[in-house]
From Swiss-Prot:
Primary role: Signaling peptide involved in the regulation of lateral organs separation.
Free-text disruption phenotype from the record: No visible phenotype.
Protein name: Signaling peptide TAXIMIN 2
Source organism, top-level taxon: Eukaryota
Alphabetical list of InterPro entries matching this protein: TAXIMIN_1/2
Taxonomic path: Eukaryota, Viridiplantae, Streptophyta, Embryophyta, Tracheophyta
Species assigned in the record: Arabidopsis thaliana
Protein localization: Secreted
Length: 73
């Protein structure tokens, strides 16, 4: 039953690499958003930007999990 899980990992790998690039972009956005929210705490949009960046950082793991669980066994 567990032999198809590596197949899902291999199929999802190119998408995970794209998600990894987005995660790096998210890390940069998170750093910029955190600095800007410290400079101007009255702007709530910077906090929302930082939360969006954290979601981008978690994206590669979510993509791999989705592909691994999508392969029927």
């Amino acid at each position: 039953m567990g032999d198809c899980r590596p197949l899902g990992f291999l199929i999802g790998l190119p998408f995970a690499l794209v998600a990894l690039v987005l995660a790096l972009v998210g890390a940069v956005i998170w750093i910029i958003g955190t600095v800007l929210s410290c400079l101007c705490p009255c702007c709530f949009c910077f906090a929302a930007l930082a939360n969006f960046a954290v979601d981008l950082i978690k994206l590669p793991i979510k993509v791999l999990r989705w592909f691994t669980h999508s392969i029927p066994c």
